Structures are given as structure tokens and as C-alpha cells.
């Protein structure tokens, strides 16, 4: 499928918004490759800290096990550190999983303004909750890279093995229905105001995430075009 991409910018500074299972883990690597940008998945950053049992990781695990969110200061500093020290972030970044609240969005804007790198776009992946439940309960993740698969919708070439490294895939422990419903309730309550925030600042764009991944990708590129 050829398409005119002349309207798509060469670099991007954006936020990817969407509930768990909306396809952020599928689309973010496409964006990273297309724009030579870094993918800052705050969930992956935190899980990495938890796995390494750093002081931050131990503190974060306690908070996450209670179904709560890690403090804004910790998250902002973690992102700032990546933007400053990660060479992959020089050409742009895709923030995934942050911000989740209006105060976070305001603090993020403030920090990015100080760096002279304000957000250009906030793309929301929109999808129905019931479809999400069926999608996410079959989700498989490659811990080292964050690549995600699905038992039904996007299976790996070899069962329970990562396509690229051949390493084992895991099913996240919080990917069961009850935990998911709790996460969705939290998502809607806390994250939907973010959409209104970015609509007001004029950088929001919405994409129907129930479509096939290739169609979603095409729609994301259209959103990123300089209007």
C-alpha cells in the first residue's frame, strides 16, 4: 500500500494516549522506527526499576501493588533523565503511559518548555471497554524489549517465543479480568480529562483503535501531518 507521506514531519514530540490493550505497544515501535525517536513507555521504565529492585523500584512496586500511581515528581524526573541522557531522544520522543492526570500534564509541559522541546501532538487510541477485555486477557509481552503479542489477534511465529530474539514471552500478572476492569475504571476516571486538556491546547487527535493495526498506523500518520 503506497501512500503520500510528504505531509508527515521528519521528527516528532508526542504523547500516545489510550487504555491498556488499545495497541500502544504495537504502534509505538512503528513510530520509533519511522521518526528515529525514543519510546518512553513509563510502565516499562517502572517495571525495569522493579525488576532491578532499585530503591525507586521497591517503592514503586508497593504503590502499584496497591493499585495506585507513582508520584508525579518521580515520573517527571525519570522522563527528564531519559530526554537528557538517551541519545535516541535527540530527534524526538513518543511518551506512552504518561501523563495520566491534569497536574502531570501541566508539570510535563513545564519541564518540556524548560528544555525547549514542547509537545507537538497528543494522539488518543479510542476503543470500547468490552473489546479491550477480550484483547488484553490474551496479551503476551517480551520483557526485555516491551514487544507485545496476542494469542489470538497477533500471535508470535513460535508459541510463547519472541519473533526477533526467540526468548520466552510472559503473560503479565495483572492481565486478568478483575485487575483489568480496575485499571479501566482508573483509566477513565483519571485519564479522560487529559484528552480535554490537549483538546484545549489544540494538539489532540483521535484514532479508532478497534481497526486492524495497519489501518491504525495509517490513521496515526495522517494525524501527525502538519495541517
UniProtKB/Swiss-Prot annotation:
It is found in: Cytoplasm, Cytosol; Mitochondrion intermembrane space. Pfam families: ADK, ADK_lid. Residues 41-70 are annotated as: NMP. One of its GO terms (cellular component) is cytosol. Its EC number is 2.7.4.3. This is Adenylate kinase. Monomer. Belongs to the adenylate kinase family. AK2 subfamily. It catalyses: AMP + ATP = 2 ADP. Residues 138-175 are annotated as: LID. It is an enzyme of class 2 (transferase). InterPro entries: Adenyl_kin_sub, Adenylat/UMP-CMP_kin, Adenylat_kinase_CS, Adenylate_kinase_lid-dom, AK2, P-loop_NTPase. The gene is ADK1. NCBIfam families: adk, PRK00279.1-2, PRK00279.1-3, PRK14527.1. Consists of three domains, a large central CORE domain and two small peripheral domains, NMPbind and LID, which undergo movements during catalysis. The LID domain closes over the site of phosphoryl transfer upon ATP binding. Assembling and dissambling the active center during each catalytic cycle provides an effective means to prevent ATP hydrolysis. AMP binds at residues 42, 47, 68-70, 97-100, 104, 172, 183. ATP binds at residues 21-26, 139, 148-149, 211. Catalyzes the reversible transfer of the terminal phosphate group between ATP and AMP. Plays an important role in cellular energy homeostasis and in adenine nucleotide metabolism. Adenylate kinase activity is critical for regulation of the phosphate utilization and the AMP de novo biosynthesis pathways. GO terms for biological process: ADP biosynthetic process; AMP metabolic process; ATP metabolic process. Keywords: ATP-binding, Cytoplasm, Kinase, Mitochondrion, Nucleotide-binding, Transferase. Its main location: cytoplasm. GO terms for molecular function: adenylate kinase activity; ATP binding. It comes from the Eukaryota.
Amino acid at each position: 500500500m503506497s501512500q503520500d507521506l510528504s505531509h508527515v514531519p521528519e521528527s516528532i514530540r508526542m504523547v500516545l494516549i489510550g487504555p491498556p490493550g488499545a495497541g500502544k505497544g504495537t504502534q509505538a515501535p512503528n513510530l520509533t522506527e519511522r521518526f528515529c525517536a525514543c519510546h518512553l513507555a513509563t510502565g516499562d521504565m517502572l517495571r525495569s526499576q522493579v525488576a532491578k529492585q532499585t530503591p525507586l523500584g521497591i517503592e514503586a512496586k508497593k504503590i502499584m501493588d496497591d493499585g495506585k500511581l507513582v508520584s508525579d515528581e518521580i515520573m517527571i524526573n525519570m522522563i527528564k533523565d531519559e530526554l537528557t541522557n538517551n541519545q535516541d531522544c535527540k530527534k524526538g520522543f513518543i511518551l506512552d503511559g504518561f501523563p495520566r492526570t491534569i497536574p502531570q500534564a501541566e508539570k510535563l509541559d513545564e519541564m518540556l518548555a524548560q528544555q525547549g522541546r514542547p509537545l507537538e501532538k497528543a494522539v488518543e487510541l479510542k476503543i470500547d471497554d468490552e473489546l479491550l477485555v477480550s484483547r488484553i486477557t490474551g496479551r503476551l509481552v517480551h520483557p526485555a524489549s516491551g514487544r507485545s503479542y496476542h494469542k489470538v489477534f497477533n500471535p508470535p511465529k513460535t508459541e510463547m517465543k519472541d519473533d526477533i530474539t526467540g526468548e520466552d514471552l510472559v503473560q503479565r500478572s495483572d492481565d486478568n479480568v478483575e485487575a483489568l476492569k480496575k485499571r479501566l475504571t482508573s483509566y477513565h476516571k483519571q485519564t479522560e480529562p487529559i484528552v480535554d486538556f490537549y483538546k484545549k491546547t489544540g494538539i489532540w487527535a483521535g484514532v479508532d483503535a478497534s481497526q486492524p493495526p495497519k489501518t491504525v498506523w495509517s490513521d496515526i500518520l495522517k494525524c501527525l501531518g502538519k495541517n
